[in-house]
């Protein structure tokens, strides 16, 4: 039997449904193979664990790693390399942001993006809470970070935002479309909620940031707050965040 801990997480009010989404996709993957799903669950940090049995178990776990990302061991981290992750515990400390890189052999190896480096990269000199608010840096937001320092003895990793993430933030702020970020739901849930609320036509594009993390790019005539009011009650407990360029620019200009 092979067990793989994926980088992708299942969390929030619809954790069970997200796991069923993964189960369905894995079932399709193994349908023509000599492999069976033994179990699908999560660890303490909500990372998805899939156990596979059969002659093709090695092939399946490798395919899962390619599709959803594989968790890491701390000694496999390399400086000056980019790693995908998700922001966690935003607002709990004032000295920086943490990104969960999927390290499974230590609970302390989340990558710290220090406040001073965030200020340099985002060109803003405000406290962390203000920066997080002005750029919508929130829990579960998928980001890519570059590791700048690793201290395995003290279990510390420092990083900076990768250029790909900085470019995404910049492009969103320059865009004249408002966005609603929706985390912890699958695409069919989001599509269904929009259709039931008669707002599917108000969304220009549904951008997938992670497996269960989406950006709803509204049409120019549509306010993201209206979409939030319409689908929020249909997806109770799902984290949603407004990304309104005009308001964010005002916050950034007020604090630089």
Where are these regions (language model features)?
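S1/OB-fold single-stranded RNA-binding interface
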Residues: 47-148
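OB-fold/S1-family RNA-binding modules
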Residues: 1-68, 131-256
């Amino acid at each position: 039997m092979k067990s793989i801990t994926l980088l992708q997480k299942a969390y929030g009010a619809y954790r069970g449904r997200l796991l069923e989404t993964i189960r369905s996709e894995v079932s399709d993957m193994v349908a023509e193979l000599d492999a069976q799903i033994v179990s699908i669950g999560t660890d303490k940090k909500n990372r998805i664990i899939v156990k596979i049995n059969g002659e093709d178990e090695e092939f399946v776990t490798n395919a899962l790693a390619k599709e959803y990302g594989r968790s890491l061991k701390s000694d496999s981290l390399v400086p000056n390399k980019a790693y995908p992750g998700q922001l966690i515990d935003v607002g709990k400390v004032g000295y920086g942001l943490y990104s969960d890189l999927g390290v499974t052999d230590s609970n302390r190896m989340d990558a710290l993006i220090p406040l001073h480096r965030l200020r340099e990269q985002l060109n803003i000199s405000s406290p962390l809470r203000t920066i997080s608010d002005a750029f919508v840096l929130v829990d579960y937001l998928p980001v890519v970070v570059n590791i700048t320092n690793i201290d395995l003895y003290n279990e510390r990793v420092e990083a900076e935002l990768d250029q790909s993430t900085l470019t995404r933030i910049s492009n969103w702020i320059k865009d004249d479309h408002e966005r609603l970020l929706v985390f912890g739901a699958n695409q069919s849930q989001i599509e269904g909620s929009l259709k039931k609320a008669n707002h599917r036509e108000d969304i220009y594009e549904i951008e997938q940031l992670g497996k269960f993390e989406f950006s709803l790019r509204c049409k120019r005539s549509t306010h993201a707050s209206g979409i939030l009011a319409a689908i929020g009650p249909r997806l109770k407990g799902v984290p949603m965040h407004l990304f309104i360029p005009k308001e964010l620019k005002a916050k950034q200009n007020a604090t630089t």
